[in-house]
Amino acid sequence: MARVKRGVQAHARHKKVLKAAKGYYSARRKTFRVAKQAVIKAGQYAYRDRKTKKRQFRQLWIIRINAGARIHGLSYSRFINGLKKSGIAVDRKILSELAVYDKSVFATLAEKAKAALSA
């Protein structure tokens, strides 16, 4: 039986890793051993940050809604409570967009929330 050399597979594997490390600086781009570690670490960061992105955007939306609600004399929690009591089901992403870009619609929502809280 002929001896099997693994040069082709090794070269393909190295090429794959170095392609994934494109755009990195110095040895992280050129040297296979260092590039492999850098690609693995980048994957770990990407996995972690896909989770934190959701948290960060929710925080941003809440900050924007709170700022918009305080202009109309409500805190964030009272505004959300008022919306729930009045039966308005709008998610935080849309509420934050309204608070930033469509202030007149947000003002009507704030008035409805106030009315539901006082009733």
Curated annotation (Swiss-Prot):
Respond yes or no to whether keyword rRNA-binding is given for this record. Answer: yes
UniProt keyword list: Ribonucleoprotein, Ribosomal protein, RNA-binding, rRNA-binding
GO CC, alphabetical: ribonucleoprotein complex; ribosome
Q: Which Pfam families match?
A: Ribosomal_L20
Keyword Heme part of the UniProt annotation: no
**CDD domains per UniProt:** Ribosomal_L20
* UniProt xrefs under InterPro entries: Ribosomal_bL20 (IPR005813), RIBOSOMAL_L20_CS (IPR049946), Ribosomal_protein_bL20_C (IPR035566)
Q: Name one GO molecular function term.
A: structural constituent of ribosome
Which N-terminal residues, if any, form the signal peptide? none
Instruction: Report which superkingdom the organism of origin falls in.
Output: Bacteria
GO terms of biological process kind: ribosomal large subunit assembly; translation
Q: Which family does it belong to?
A: Belongs to the bacterial ribosomal protein bL20 family.
What's its job? Binds directly to 23S ribosomal RNA and is necessary for the in vitro assembly process of the 50S ribosomal subunit. It is not involved in the protein synthesizing functions of that subunit.
Name the chain's protein.
Large ribosomal subunit protein bL20
Biological source species:
Dichelobacter nodosus (strain VCS1703A)
